[in-house]
Amino acid sequence: MDLAMEQWSWKDKLLLFIIPRFYSLVLRFLARTIRKEVFFPERPRNFWDQGQHVIAAFWHQRLLMMPFLPWGKVSVLISQHRDGEFIARAVKFLGYDSVRGSTTRGGISALREMIRVFRKGSDIAVTPDGPQGPKHVVQIGVVELARLTGAPILPVTYSASCCKVFGSWDNFILPLPFSKVAYLWGEPLFVPRDAGKDKLEESRLLLQERMRQITEEADRIFQKKS
């Protein structure tokens, strides 16, 4: 247990023991009731079939059902704030590893750790507008990660036929039981190793636009507005 955890009260530690387990069970139940369809699954599979790994990028708004996409070994970037500890534990119960940090807090150390786990043979999953926004604005960290690893960034999203939209900064989406969920993979984006500041910004904006496009495309399946 790290020093920060030692400062938690016994009540907080009890909640940390209970909530992630309960959350993962509820989420698994929800996923079992939902009918899922994946569009363009060949986009990541083309890399996986060649033994290559990818960086999957999805909006914070749409992260809830991402654990139920067909994945191989994947590590998820999760923020270092207090809520992130609960999320990291829940992700572990769902069978995934986590890297702690974000595009702001702990960014450099998280970047180094993501490079390390990628080179050991893992996909990386990130929410490039998380953990605090602005909504649907890509931060530069994911682009820098792609430059340093040579991995393609593949945007991915989902939409649901029936869902609850929360009033949070990201308008977080909770698909309702027995709804339909459509996942959609976007086209890969490569960032040259020698990319300078201007090229990195160009890549950031291109990724942001592709993520916007696939989100709109997924929402059109159920005629929703993101």
Residue ranges, per PLM feature:
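Structural signal for conserved beta-strand scaffold positions within catalytic alpha/beta enzyme cores
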Residues: 38, 78, 100, 155, ...
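Catalytic core of membrane glycerolipid acyltransferases/transacylases, capturing the structured
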Residues: 50-105, 149
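Short amphipathic alpha-helical segments and helix-helix/interface helices
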Residues: 44-45, 88, 142-143
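Short, flexible loop segments at the rims of nucleotide/cofactor-binding pockets, characterized by
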Residues: 31-36, 53-54, 101-105, 131-132
